[in-house]
């Protein structure tokens, strides 16, 4: 019912690669091959700090053809609820972690005539494995990567060295912006655009493409959102007959997991729909923070994405 089975791994390498960004290489604790994955996949990393249980999704950036290890990059964000800070401050070479099996909600479609990647900041990570995979298939692609500065950017030199003119870097500190309208206007019929980065960048890229007449089925995006904090509230579970308190820094899903309650999830970012749960009663306004439910579904108040959304106070009764 819930997300995939966990696997114990050891951190073989942990190193800074840019301002506030660390790269972690993970291997099986028994040195067995890890599960196969495709470009664009991510894993959930389980972190335990005291009585807190955290699970953060991170894109796999290593080569899909090499399952001897996985590589992820973690940005230490200012408004972290603890996960990225925990990885930066507590996880070093030799540390052991639990991870979920790879999941791909952001694949490069093999039928596309060309792949146009638009990345911002840490949003470069899913494209690392996608480009490796497509390069092996001799598929046509190009990358447009927006960064604040070279000090804040990860893997610029590595990407340019490997892929040459297919990689385009735009530095904000040099006044450079991705010329998106020009980039998209030059693409041939059958090209697909993929964007990953901050939400404003994703919205800008998708809106620009649609204004230029790109079909919606040729547009793909991924954003790993974290549920915003709030005030504590109660969750009543009808089927299990339990009531739990969701603390201010927790999502409903995290609170359920902390109390040993099995609940559905996959992406943990409000995008896949797996954790959509029926609301039977609610004392207060639901703060819908997901990207999955339609506006009509949100207004109805009959569904909630327990990985991202919450109420402001009181209690909510769920069909769990």
Where are these regions (language model features)?
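Local cysteine-cluster metal-coordination motifs and their immediate loop/turn environment
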Residues: 126, 261-285, 296-313
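Short, surface-exposed secondary-structure boundary micro-motifs
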Residues: 48, 102-103, 280
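Ferredoxin-reductase
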Residues: 2-96, 147-149
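Short flanking/linker segments adjacent to small metal-binding domains or redox-active Cys/His motifs
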Residues: 173-175, 247, 309-320
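FNR/FR-type flavoprotein reductase catalytic core
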Residues: 2-3, 85-241, 245
């Amino acid at each position: 019912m819930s997300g995939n089975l966990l696997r114990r791994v050891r951190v073989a390498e942990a190193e800074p690669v840019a301002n506030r960004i660390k790269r972690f290489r993970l291997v099986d604790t028994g040195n067995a091959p890890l599960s196969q994955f495709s470009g664009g996949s991510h894993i959930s990393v389980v972190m335990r700090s005291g009585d807190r249980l955290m699970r953060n999704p991170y894109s796999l950036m290593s080569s899909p053809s090499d399952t001897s290890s996985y590589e992820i990059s973690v940005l230490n964000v200012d408004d972290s609820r603890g996960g990225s800070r925990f990885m930066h401050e507590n996880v070093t070479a030799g540390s052991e972690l639990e991870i979920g099996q790879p999941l791909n909600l952001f694949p490069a479609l093999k039928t596309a005539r060309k792949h146009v990647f638009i990345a911002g900041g840490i949003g470069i990570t899913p494209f690392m494995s996608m480009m490796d995979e497509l390069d092996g298939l001799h598929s046509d692609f190009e990358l447009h990567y927006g960064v604040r500065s070279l000090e804040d950017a990860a893997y610029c030199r590595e990407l340019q060295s490997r892929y040459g003119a297919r990689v385009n870097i735009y530095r904000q500190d040099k006044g450079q912006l991705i010329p998106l309208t020009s980039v998209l206007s030059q693409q041939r019929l059958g090209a697909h655009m993929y964007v990953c980065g901050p939400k404003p960048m994703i919205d800008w890229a998708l809106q620009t493409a649609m204004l230029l007449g790109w079909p919606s089925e040729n547009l793909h995006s991924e954003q790993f959102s974290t549920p915003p904090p709030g005030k504590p509230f109660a969750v009543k579970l009808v089927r299990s007959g339990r009531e739990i308190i969701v603390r201010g820094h927790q999502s409903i899903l995290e609170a359920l997991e902390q109390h040993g309650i099995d609940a559905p999830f996959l992406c943990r970012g409000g995008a896949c729909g797996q954790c959509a749960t029926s609301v039977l009663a609610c004392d207060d306004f639901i703060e819908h923070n997901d990207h999955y439910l339609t506006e009509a579904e949100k207004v109805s108040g009959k569904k909630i994405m327990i990985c991202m959304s919450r109420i402001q106070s009181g209690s909510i009764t769920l069909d769990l």
